[in-house]
Amino acid sequence: MPMDEIAATDPVAILREIEESCRVCNTTDSRQAIEIFSEWSGIAFRIGRNRLLAPLDEVVEILDMPKLARVPLAQPWVRGIANIRGNLLPVVDFSGFLGGEVATVTEKTRVLVIDYDGIYSGLVVDEVFGLKHFMESEHADAAPDVDGFLLPYIRNRYRRDGRVWCEFSLFALADTPQFLQTAI
């Protein structure tokens, strides 16, 4: 009996027909191989010439550069404190902290906010490109082409369109004792 006729007559018959269709689809003869791909997602950003990825679960929020209150007697890489919806957010110059050149603030400058093990902090980056997804097949063993001061925090690399993207662990950065030593 065609499905149209069943629908017009008996709802229980409709359910039986659906169940039978599912049974047919699940037989070994009609099964199709399903490939499951492992995907990794991260926030793509830039520090100087370095294009990096932050694991998605390590970034709480991405902000435009907020207004900052200066912190006296702080390291030069401490940009200041921002009031974000009633929460005080210490803002650190990402590159400056790692020994690189202090970032120049432009309209593309963003702040990556982390909240790790009691450390709530913002990291100034030159630019954020957005969310990137990489398949397991895009994992690369190539040596990272990034400034040396970033190397201790590089976890994985992915190749796409001739470019190698390096996964940078913001949590590993926040775990360093120097990150908490903000006073001069």
Model-derived segments and spans:
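An acidic, low-aromatic, low-complexity terminal/linker signal
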Residues: 1-184
